[in-house]
Swiss-Prot record:
CDD domains: PNPsynthase
Keywords assigned: Cytoplasm, Pyridoxine biosynthesis, Transferase
Classification lineage: Bacteria, Bacillati, Cyanobacteriota, Cyanophyceae, Nostocales
UniProt-recorded name of the protein: Pyridoxine 5'-phosphate synthase
Major subcellular site: cytoplasm
Localization of this protein: Cytoplasm
Organism, as annotated: Nostoc sp. (strain PCC 7120 / SAG 25.82 / UTEX 2576)
The keyword Cytoplasm is assigned to this record: yes
């Protein structure tokens, strides 16, 4: 069964809304791990709208599971990753005007640049995951740039408005997962997953880890982080 990476970006979103010092993402990560998180994920955006550089530096020293740093494939972010050395990096697309990450990274259209970044990071013993749509061409390109992981973008599945569409999107994810594993990639998934839709994705053969943030932080506002994480672990198990 898939493990759970808890994205704590929106703890920082609340903090940055008032430009204050609380709530503290580092404390949130500790509580998430106490609740059973198998990993902690943060996205250091170029505009620093939520997670800050200092957060990542502190998390590198305090996270006891593993730290997944989401970032754009820019020289600045590569330098930060090489300095901090997270347990692994997930390369994601990024637009300043977006509310959250929209769609997967286009590996096919920028294969030389992505290949260069993957090489730099993995030569420094930092495994790289690529956040992509489950398109056969994107999976093939991910193999070509020698990434260790892909993270399948589950947004269309999560946003499906009827059962027929949802099942079509799930089948698309399943096919992508199977193709990637056969090609030697390890497979994670995330984006838009909730307590109510997570199990079918978690149950896909070979799925390793689900990176989930917004729904857990929303639930945590009502019941606390530890309980919210425990409940997501139960949902992943289909309980």
């Amino acid at each position: 069964m898939a493990t759970l990476g808890v994205n704590i970006d929106h703890i920082a979103t609340i903090r940055q809304a008032r430009r204050t010092v609380e709530p503290d993402p580092v404390a949130a990560a500790v509580l998430a791990e106490l609740g059973g998180a198998d990993g902690i994920t943060v996205h250091l955006r170029e505009d620093r709208r939520h997670i800050q550089d200092r957060d990542v530096q502190l998390l590198r020293h305090t996270v006891r599971t593993h730290l997944n740093l989401e970032m754009a494939a820019t020289d600045e972010m590569v330098g930060i990753a090489l300095d901090i050395k997270p347990d692994y990096v997930t390369l994601v697309p990024e637009k300043r005007e977006e509310v959250t990450t929209e769609g997967g990274l286009d590996i096919v259209g920028q294969i030389a640049r992505i290949g260069e970044v993957v090489s730099k990071l993995q030569n420094a013993a930092i495994p790289v995951s690529l956040f992509i749509d489950a398109e056969p061409s994107q999976i093939e390109a991910s193999v070509k740039v020698q990434a260790k992981f892909i993270e399948l973008h589950t947004g269309r599945y999560a946003e499906a408005t009827d059962e027929t569409s949802r099942q079509q999107e799930l089948a698309f994810l399943a096919a992508g997962c199977e193709q990637a594993i056969k090609a030697g990639l390890r497979v994670n998934a995330g984006h838009g997953l909730t307590y109510w839709n997570v199990y079918p994705v978690a149950a896909l053969p070979g799925m390793e880890e689900l990176n989930i943030g917004h729904t857990i932080i929303s639930r945590a506002a009502l019941v606390g982080i530890e309980r919210a994480v425990r409940e997501m672990k139960q949902a992943i198990r289909g309980e």
